[in-house]
């Protein structure tokens, strides 16, 4: 994955992570959360649709005492407002806006002005702001876009051991492509 993100998720900007179910999108977000909390950073997970699983985060060794989990009850507008307020409040190393459960039509209708506002707010902080969804929504407002696509399962004998994922990133219109295998 380092080949795709070229050294990690940038701070002080908006990154988009997109992919369908089983693409590794949530696993990557939980890995980021785990790394940030283990380094002593406070993090926020804005959960638009109540899909965050604390047990999965614990399994990845995330420190849940360093996590503020905001459940927006299926309301994307509330999630955007919460993200805006929390990124402006400062003090967080990672802010995740999880729109994965939001209907695609709703996510596409988020105005570019909202994305520009979030990007501008992130630029005044040291936080990594990551928006996750089924598709790229913020378009030109994000500095890094990572698109994941499931490729094929990885088998050892008759046991499923992981999944191969194709990833493509766009960094201010420079495209990098790589593939990686997630094995448990």
Give residue spans per PLM region.
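Short, glycine/charged-enriched secondary-structure capping and boundary segments
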Residues: 31, 58-61, 109-112, 144-147
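Switch/connector loops and helix/strand junctions flanking conserved nucleotide-binding motifs
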Residues: 53-55, 78, 105-106, 138-142
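Phosphate-binding/switch region of NTP-binding enzymes
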Residues: 119-184
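Phosphate-binding/switch loop-helix module in NTP-utilizing enzymes
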Residues: 72-125, 130
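The Walker A/P-loop phosphate-binding site
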Residues: 1-64, 76, 84-88
